[in-house]
Design a protein with these regions (language model features):
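Surface-exposed, charge/polar-rich loops and edge strands
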Residues: 1-223
Length: 223
C-alpha cells in the first residue's frame, strides 16, 4: 500500500472554527480557496507531510487514523470495484475530507505514530456532540520516511468510506478524459490521488468516525 505524504491545505489555527463552519461547496470552490489563502485563513504546508487524526467520542471511545494520499489505481480490488460504480461528474478543486479505510494493525507502525502524538497537536477542539478532535502534523524527514516505509508493508485496505472513494474516482475519470482530450495528461495530476484516513483494526468491525469537513484537504484541481 503506497500511501504518500502530501502538501495539505488546512485552516490557520486561529481560523479553524470559521473554516469548519463553511458549506462544503464553498470550501471546494477555487475562488473561495484563493481568497482564503490570500487572507491567511487557509494555509498550504510547504513540504509533503503525514497527519494523525484522533477522534474521541463522548463515551470515551478513541480512534486514531493516519492521513495521507494514495493513487486511486493502486487501491485493492474490493475498493476499486466499489469506486467504479459511481457516475462521473465535475471535479472539485479540493477533496475536503478523507475517505476512511481500515487496515490490519501493524505494531511497529503503532509505535511510530504513538511517538508522533507526544508533541502538541495542531488542532484540539470539541464538536456539539462532545466528540474531541485532535490533529498532529508529521513533517520531520526521518518520521515521514519511517512511516512511508511501514505503510508500504500494509497488504490491503478495506473501504469504509460510504461513497467518498466512489465520488473521487468518478471525478478523476472526468478530469482524466478532459486532460487526455487536451493532450496535457501526464498521470501525475493531483486528481489521480485520493485523501485517505487509515484506521488500524484487529479484525472486529467498528464504525469509523468522520473527520469534520475542511480540517485537512487535498487539492485535486488547479486554482
Amino acid at each position: 500500500m503506497n500511501v504518500l505524504p502530501f502538501p495539505c491545505l488546512r485552516p490557520a489555527e486561529d481560523h479553524v472554527i470559521e473554516v469548519l463552519s463553511q458549506p462544503i461547496d464553498t470550501l471546494a470552490s477555487a475562488g473561495s480557496i484563493l481568497q482564503a489563502q490570500e487572507a491567511g485563513i487557509l494555509l498550504k504546508d510547504a513540504r509533503p507531510s503525514y497527519y494523525l487524526y484522533e477522534n474521541t467520542a463522548a463515551n470515551g471511545t478513541c480512534q486514531t487514523a493516519l492521513i495521507g494520499i494514495c493513487a486511486l489505481e493502486s487501491l485493492v480490488c474490493d475498493v476499486a470495484q466499489s469506486v467504479e460504480a459511481a457516475p462521473s461528474s465535475a471535479c472539485p478543486a479540493l477533496q475536503c475530507t478523507p475517505a476512511p479505510v481500515t487496515y490490519k494493525r501493524q505494531p511497529v507502525l503503532d509505535v511510530i505514530l504513538s511517538a508522533a502524538q507526544q508533541g502538541a497537536p495542531l488542532y484540539d477542539l470539541y464538536d456539539p456532540a462532545r466528540a474531541r478532535h485532535r490533529i498532529w502534523h508529521i513533517g520531520r524527514t526521518e518520521a515521514v520516511e519511517a512511516i512511508r516505509t511501514m505503510v508500504q508493508q500494509i497488504p490491503s485496505v478495506s473501504d469504509g468510506s460510504s461513497g467518498v472513494l466512489a465520488s473521487m474516482a468518478a471525478h478523476a475519470r472526468t478530469a482524466r478524459k478532459e486532460a487526455q482530450a487536451a493532450g496535457t495528461y501526464t498521470g501525475r495530476e493531483p486528481f489521480n490521488y485520493v485523501l485517505l484516513a487509515l484506521y488500524p483494526t484487529d479484525g472486529a468491525k467498528t464504525a469509523l468516525p468522520s473527520m469534520p469537513v475542511g480540517f485537512l484537504a487535498h487539492q485535486v484541481a488547479k486554482l
